[in-house]
């Protein structure tokens, strides 16, 4: 029995973590499968240690290729240890970020090339792709303003990047979304949280009606 794999993507400040948690609350009493919520970078013991290296604001000297490879290494461990076993059990896996983040942040934002970063991650994940990606669409400036309001002074290394970087990341996401219209569905994340959650729940239920 094969499971289902849903990823949530979007710029920093779009509210991915909050939305995922609210979506789970909304569907867990109705879903016929176990639900596993996870995140990237991280999701497993080794992957979380790599996460700490990647996001540590002190690591300002980290070059773009190192950053991309660390994300891929974390993802490889996450997939083999957490995601694939859950999918084999038949679970519904919901991940806060996945490969699309690397394509947008390192491929476009860091200028490494989306295709090049895609190749690295295809190797790292064994070509695993989500069944559905919900992209929480938010203007980068608005996202950074949200972060500053909530976590002022405690932003991670990527959140501390200037607006120009985050705008480039957003352009990367747009390219990825346009290349995968069947997989990626867009939700306006500038709406109030209940509206964003409702739209996300609707997408999950309409994409996988057999789960409910």
From Swiss-Prot:
A Pfam entry, by short name: Thymidylate_kin
Keyword ATP-binding: yes
Residues the entry annotates as binding ATP: 10-17
Catalysed reactions listed for this entry: dTMP + ATP = dTDP + ADP
GO cellular component, one term: cytosol
Entry's Gene Ontology BP terms: dTDP biosynthetic process; dTTP biosynthetic process; dUDP biosynthetic process
Entry-linked InterPro entries: P-loop_NTPase (IPR027417), Thymidylate_kin-like_dom (IPR039430), Thymidylate_kinase (IPR018094)
A single GO molecular function term of this UniProt record: dTMP kinase activity
Keywords: ATP-binding, Kinase, Nucleotide biosynthesis, Nucleotide-binding, Transferase
Family: Belongs to the thymidylate kinase family.
Reported function: Phosphorylation of dTMP to form dTDP in both de novo and salvage pathways of dTTP synthesis.
Name of the featured protein: Thymidylate kinase
Organism lineage string: Bacteria, Bacillati, Bacillota, Bacilli, Lactobacillales
Name of the encoding gene: tmk
């Amino acid at each position: 029995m094969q499971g289902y794999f849903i990823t949530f993507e979007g710029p920093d400040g779009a509210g991915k973590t909050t939305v995922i948690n609210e979506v789970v609350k909304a569907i867990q009493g109705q879903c016929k499968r176990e639900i596993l919520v996870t995140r990237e970078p991280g999701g497993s013991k080794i992957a979380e240690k790599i996460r700490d290296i990647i996001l540590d604001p002190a690591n300002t000297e980290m070059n773009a290729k190192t950053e991309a490879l660390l994300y891929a290494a974390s993802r490889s461990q996450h997939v083999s240890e957490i995601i694939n076993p859950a999918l084999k059990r038949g679970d519904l896996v919901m991940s806060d970020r996945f490969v699309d983040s690397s394509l947008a942040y390192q491929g476009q934002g860091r200028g490494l090339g989306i295709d090049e970063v895609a190749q690295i991650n295809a190797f790292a994940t064994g070509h695993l792709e989500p069944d559905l990606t919900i992209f929480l669409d938010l203007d980068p400036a608005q996202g950074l303003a949200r972060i500053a309001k909530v976590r002022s002074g405690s932003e991670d290394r990527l959140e501390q990047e200037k607006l120009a970087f985050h705008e480039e990341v957003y352009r990367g996401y747009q390219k990825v979304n346009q290349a995968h219209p069947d997989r990626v569905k867009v939700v306006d994340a500038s709406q109030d949280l209940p509206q964003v959650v409702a739209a996300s729940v609707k997408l999950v239920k309409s994409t996988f009606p057999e789960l409910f």
